[in-house]
Design a protein with these regions (language model features):
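N-terminal cap/lid segment of alpha/beta-hydrolase-fold proteins
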Residues: 1-14
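Active-site loop/oxyanion-hole signature of alpha/beta-hydrolase fold enzymes
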Residues: 11, 18-21, 53, 60-104, ...
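Conserved HGGG/HGGXW glycine-rich cap/lid loop of the alpha/beta-hydrolase fold
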Residues: 20-68
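Glycine-rich nucleophile elbow surrounding the catalytic serine of serine-hydrolase chemistry
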Residues: 105-114
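Flexible "cap/lid" loop of the alpha/beta hydrolase fold
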Residues: 117, 124-156
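Conserved alpha/beta-hydrolase catalytic His-Asp/Glu region
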Residues: 139, 156-217
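Conserved serine/cysteine hydrolase catalytic core
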Residues: 192-244, 253
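Catalytic active-site module of serine/aspartate enzymes centered on a nucleophile-bearing elbow/loop
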Residues: 249-279
Length: 279
């Protein structure tokens, strides 16, 4: 099963996305996979074929400002949660996704959850993979410093920050081939660093967390919470607290995984997601 690479222009912004389709016809709803910071849709490339093999088409975009998607100037794109939500809404409308299951991960996963809460009619099922889900969630220092005056401007222009951040969060080394993909946007243009800087500075986790906490208490769609027990940035207590507030949600922990479970434990993540989608 191959994963295709596509681009589409939405409101003058180029979106890059990956798409995996089952062989033959399938009546299953698509799965939309959203990545975190400073990751890319590439992080889902081992999961997508597994979904397709079981009949689930999947789409994984690079957020605006990340990967191979457009990296507009801050004067043209605010890099706030609302700006990301609006851009995502238009992307989904352009692809004519009427209803789908949503999988979110990491520190942009919160924006994906906000989208779901604001558009529940679109969401069949919701899976939350190691994302900030409460007002108490804080960016780890490794990410906080990327938004600091002067220091952040320098750090976000260093392609090796990808190595330090992804490996620091996952607690494992990534292969050189994988790191080459993640570094490439930073080597190609300074725009990648500027977009990352703007995103970190405008993430508004406290405000987002309040909206998420309130909204998920009323959430009706089936929900899966997946957490890496070795996540150094978002402890499993965050997931346990969310589960306590959502009695109908399912919590699955992965003993060996850190903040980016789909990177090193893609087979386990795939199995958990497929089991959830089938129920």
């Amino acid at each position: 099963m191959t994963t295709n690479e596509e681009t589409i222009e939405v409101s003058s912004l180029k979106w890059f996305y990956r798409e995996a389709k089952p062989l033959g016809r399938s009546d299953k709803l698509p799965v939309l996979l959203l990545h975190g910071i400073p990751s890319q849709s590439y992080s889902w490339t081992e999961v997508m074929p597994a979904l397709a093999d079981k009949g689930y088409p999947s789409i994984a975009p690079d957020w605006i400002g990340f990967g191979l998607s457009a990296k507009p100037d801050r004067r043209d794109f605010a890099y706030t949660p609302d700006a990301f939500i609006q851009a995502l809404t238009e992307f989904i409308e352009t692809l004519e996704l009427e209803r789908f299951s949503l999988v979110v991960q990491g520190f942009l996963g919160s924006v994906g959850i906000q989208y779901a809460l604001r558009h529940p009619e679109k969401i069949e099922r919701l899976a939350i993979v190691g994302a900030p889900v409460s007002p108490e969630a804080k960016l780890p220092w490794k990410l906080q410093q990327l938004g600091l005056p002067f220091l952040g401007d320098m750090l976000t222009q260093d392609p090796l920050l990808v190595d330090r951040t992804l490996e620091g969060g996952s607690c494992y080394n990534l292969s050189d081939a994988d790191l080459d993909v993640y570094r490439r946007p930073f080597l190609k243009s300074s725009d990648a660093g500027r977009s990352l800087l703007a995103t970190v500075r405008n993430l508004q986790l406290t405000e987002i967390g309040a909206e998420i906490t309130s909204g998920l208490k009323q959430w009706q769609q089936p929900t899966l919470i997946v957490w890496g027990m070795k996540d150094p940035w978002l402890p499993v207590s965050c997931a346990e607290q969310l589960k306590a507030e959502m009695p109908n949600a399912e919590l699955v922990t992965i003993e060996e995984a850190g903040h980016y479970p789909q990177e090193h434990w893609s087979e386990k993540v795939s199995d958990v997601l497929i089991g959830f989608l089938r129920r």
